[in-house]
C-alpha cells in the first residue's frame, strides 16, 4: 500500500517550520462557486468542491507485498506535480510525500540492532535540529518522553539523504533525519502500540524547547511516511531508501 500526497501550504510559516509545515492540508481554497462545475445531481453537489492536496492510492488487492507498489506510487506522485507549487525558485517545492507499509525486511537489514517481530515495534522518521549538538539533546529528550510513556527506544538510524537535488531555500532550512525505533515492554502491538505512540509523538511536538524542536510525520507499527519540502520528482531522489526493493 502506498498513499501519495502533493501538498499545498496555505499560510506563511517560519523558515524553521517549513519542513514540518508541509503536513498542512488546505480544506477550502475555493471560496466561490465555479460556473463551469456541473449542476447538483444525485449525490453530487458543487458546493462540496474544494481545491486541496493531490492524493493517490496504490495497492495490491490480494495483499501481496511488492516494491512495484512503491514504484507506481512515486510515479503517481510525479504525475501530480501540478497539485504542488513552487515560487520563483523552481527547484524548491512546497511539499510532497509518500506513506507506505513498514518495510520490515529492509529495516532489519539496515537498522544495526535487533528488532522485535513485525507489529511489536514502531518506526518513524524524525526531523531533528540541523545542529548536531541540539539534535543530540533532542534525542535524549525524546527517549525520556518515551520512557515516561512506558515505551522503550530500541535505537536510532541515520536516514541516508541526497540534498543535491534540492533548491537553495530547502537546503537552507533542512533538518537532520533520524529513524526512531520503539517498542512496548508491556507487549502492546499494532493499533494498541500506535495509540501509545500517538501520545508520545504529541508530547515530543509540544514539550521540547525551541532549539530541540523535532517533528515526526509518522510514528507507527504499521506505516511509515517519507516526506519533505520537495517538488514531486525530488522525493525519490532525496530518499535512497525508496529505491531499495526490500
Regions found by a protein language model. Name each.
Residues 2-246:
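N-terminal segments that mediate ammonia production and transfer
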Amino acid at each position: 500500500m502506498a498513499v501519495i500526497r502533493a501538498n499545498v501550504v496555505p499560510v506563511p510559516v517560519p523558515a524553521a517550520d517549513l519542513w514540518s509545515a508541509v503536513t498542512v492540508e488546505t480544506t477550502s481554497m475555493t471560496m466561490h462557486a465555479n460556473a463551469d462545475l456541473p449542476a447538483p445531481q444525485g449525490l453530487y453537489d458543487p458546493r462540496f468542491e474544494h481545491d486541496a492536496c493531490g492524493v493517490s492510492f496504490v495497492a495490491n488487492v490480494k495483499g501481496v507485498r511488492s516494491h512495484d507498489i512503491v514504484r507506481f506510487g512515486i510515479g503517481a506522485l510525479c504525475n501530480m506535480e501540478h497539485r504542488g507549487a513552487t515560487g520563483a525558485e523552481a527547484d524548491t517545492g512546497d511539499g510532497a510525500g509518500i506513506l507506505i507499509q513498514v518495510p520490515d525486511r529492509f529495516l532489519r537489514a539496515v537498522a544495526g540492532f535487533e528488532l522485535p517481530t513485525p507489529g511489536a515495534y514502531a518506526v518513524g522518521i524524525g526531523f531533528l535540529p540541523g545542529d548536531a549538538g541540539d539534535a543530540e539533546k533532542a534525542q535524549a529528550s525524546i527517549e525520556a518522553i518515551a520512557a515516561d510513556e512506558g515505551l522503550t527506544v530500541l535505537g536510532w538510524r541515520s536516514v541516508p539523504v541526497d540534498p543535491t537535488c534540492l533548491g537553495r531555500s530547502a537546503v537552507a532550512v533542512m533538518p537532520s533525519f533520524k529513524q526512531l525505533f520503539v517498542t512496548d515492554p508491556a507487549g502492546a502491538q499494532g493499533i494498541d502500540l500506535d495509540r501509545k505512540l500517538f501520545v508520545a509523538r504529541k508530547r515530543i511536538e509540544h514539550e521540547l524547547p525551541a532549539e530541540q524542536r523535532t517533528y515526526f510525520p509518522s510514528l507507527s507499527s504499521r506505516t511509515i511516511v517519507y516526506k519533505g519540502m520537495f517538488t514531486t520528482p525530488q522525493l525519490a531522489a532525496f530518499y535512497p531508501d525508496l529505491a531499495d526493493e526490500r
